[in-house]
Structure formats: C-alpha cells, structure tokens
Regions:
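The feature marks the mature, well-folded catalytic cores of soluble enzymes
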Residues: 1-289
Length: 289
C-alpha cells in the first residue's frame, strides 16, 4: 500500500531538480494534494500552461506527455526533465507500434485525463472510449489497435475490447495490455479486502483516477465505502461499534497520509483491517492487520 514506484521516482526527480535550482512542473506531478503542497513548500512552481513557465528547467509529470508537446517545450529553449512513469512510456511505445503496423488507434480511458491526452496527441484521429455506448458509436474500420490508460481496471478494458471485436467481426482488433501491474495488484487486493470488511476507507487525491477506480471496485463488494484525502476527512459516523474497517489507498498516496488515517481510525477504538505494510510500495497485498 502507498506510492507505486513510478510516482515515487517522479517525486524524487522533482526534489533533485528543485535542489539544483528553480524548476517548474508542467501540471500536477501526481494527483495528490499532500504531495503537491510539499513540492510548493520546496519552492517548486506548478504551471498548467506551457507559455506560463517562468524557469528554464521544466519537469514533465508522471502521467507523461506527447512527443509533440515535449518537442515544443525544447524548441522554446526549455530544459525538459521527464518524470514520466516507465509504464506510461510503455503505453506510448505500444500505441506507436500499432499505428506503425497499420492499425487505427483506440485508447480506452478518460478523454480529459492528462495521460490520455499525452497518448493521443501524436496520433490524429485516435479514438478514445470508456463505455460500451462509445464503442458502439465507432465507425467500422478494417484494423483497430487498442491500448488503455494505465490505471483503468483490466476487467473493464477486456470488456470493451471484446465489445469492439463483437461489433466488428470482420475487422482485426489487436489489443496490447498497458494496464500497469501495480494497478492490477491493488485492484485485486482491494476487491478481496472489501469482501471481508463492514466499511472500507479509500485514501487518495480527489483527482486521482486510480483512487476513483479503487472506490468503484470496493463498492462492488462492500456497501459502505468512503473516499478521503487525509485523516482530516475521517467522519466518526462512518464507523459503528464492532465494525471491521479496511484501508486501501491510491498509488499516489504518501505513506504518511495513510499512517495518519490509520492512527485516527485506531483512536476511534474500532477494529481495523488494513493491507500489510511489509510489502514494497509498488505492490498491494490485503491481509488482516
């Protein structure tokens, strides 16, 4: 439980660059307010418009960016440092290979998410879908090449790939699984955890896609699921005497925030069942505490 390696490495890079001199992160480095507040406290600037970058050094977020965007930043004289998660890089490479092989690109994910924008900007005409209805609106093409946003539930991705293949049986549909392993592991662990708890607390940033998906997964197995960003959001009314409470967290959530929620929960004198803390941050194993 806690940060995955991609998020951790991105934060370390931002810390290194801020220690070396003025630096701007183009966008939210990760979708967690505690992390962003810490970066600001270290003097890191956060800007969302490339034209508004006041420093020579600029960091690309863990969610990645298109080749076109990075080339534009370099052409404007900026020194670009990529904090892109390696598994997001892998998704970019997979999509490029599919397009080079003659497949029409399709990305399964949130169209307005920064990771998805980074995937699609280099491929004009790329389709983005996140529901069966959106798949059904796609025009028929002879060949589809499919990847997904790395934090989508793999079961949902498979469902939409199957839907695409069933809708166009004469078309060739080639799917490269780009859902990251930490997401898969955490989804599996969260589902198991939710199945044996009365209440589940999901800790993560309000704009974190992988946290949102964890909430959805937990709600499929448990009727009382609450999404909170920190211990300050914990409502005693959520927990009844004798409840077994599970804790899980998004892959951009710092251990310190999770520890704070767990401490607040224990202070409420309820039984707590949380994911094992002895596992590496990139993995999740749900066990009784």
């Amino acid at each position: 439980m806690g940060m995955c390696f991609g998020v951790r490495d991105a934060i370390e890079l931002a810390h290194e660059r801020s220690a070396a001199g003025p630096v701007t992160v183009l966008g939210d480095l990760v979708h967690n307010e505690a992390v962003l507040s810490d970066l600001r406290a270290r003097g890191v600037l956060i800007r969302h418009d490339p034209a508004d970058v006041p420093t020579r050094d600029v960091v690309i977020t863990a969610h990645g960016a298109s080749d076109r965007r990075i080339a534009g930043l370099k052409a404007s004289g900026l020194q670009v440092f990529e904090a892109t998660c390696p598994l997001v890089h892998r998704a970019h490479q997979a999509l490029r290979r599919l397009v080079a092989a003659g497949f029409h690109p399709v990305v399964i994910g949130q169209a307005d998410h920064v990771e998805v924008r980074g995937l699609t900007e280099d491929h004009p005409g790329c389709e983005v879908v996140l529901s069966e209805e959106e798949v059904d609106r796609l025009p028929e093409r002879p060949r589809y090449g499919v990847v997904s946003q790395t934090t989508q539930p793999v079961s949902r991705v498979r469902q939409l790939v199957d839907r695409l293949a069933a809708r166009f049986p004469a078309s060739e549909v080639r799917w490269t699984d780009t859902v990251c392993q930490p997401t898969k592991d955490r989804q599996t662990a969260a589902e198991a955890l939710a199945g044996r708890c009365d209440v589940v607390l999901v800790v993560g940033g309000a704009h974190s896609n992988n946290t949102r998906r964890l909430v959805d997964t937990c709600r499929s197995r448990c009727g009382r699921v609450h999404w909170l960003q920190s211990a300050a959001d914990l409502d005693p009314a959520w927990v009844r005497e004798g409840d077994t409470v599970g804790i899980t967290a998004g892959t951009s959530t710092p251990d310190s925030v999770i520890d704070g929620v767990e401490a607040a929960l224990r202070a409420m004198s309820c039984r707590s069942r949380s994911e094992a803390r002895s596992q590496p941050p990139s993995e999740t194993r749900a066990k009784a505490a």
